């Protein structure tokens, strides 16, 4: 799921520059301790998006979940299968 223009401000377990938002989702799925991620809302001058992999989610850190003009926050709603389905549905409807 996505919380557009939101940012979970916790210490990341990894940061990458990516081409597309779903690249960050794939990276998160490869790390068992990744539960959510922030992706830059807009690309940098080289067309890349910053991806921040996070070890927790907005439900366990609601005090550090904030509005942002620079990021979108993605989190796993129920299961990884549901998550991927919703991620691709959102991407297709952009």
Role assignments for model-derived ranges:
Residues 1-94:
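Extracellular disulfide-rich cysteine clusters
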């Amino acid at each position: 799921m996505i919380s557009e223009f939101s940012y979970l401000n916790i210490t990341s377990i990894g940061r990458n520059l990516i081409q597309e938002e779903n690249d960050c989702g794939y990276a998160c799925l490869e790390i068992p301790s990744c539960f959510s991620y922030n992706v830059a809302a807009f690309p940098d001058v080289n067309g890349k998006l910053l991806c921040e992999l996070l070890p927790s989610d907005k439900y366990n850190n609601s005090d550090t979940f904030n509005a942002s003009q620079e990021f979108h926050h993605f989190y796993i709603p129920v299961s990884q299968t549901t998550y991927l389905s919703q991620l691709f549905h959102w991407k297709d409807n952009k």
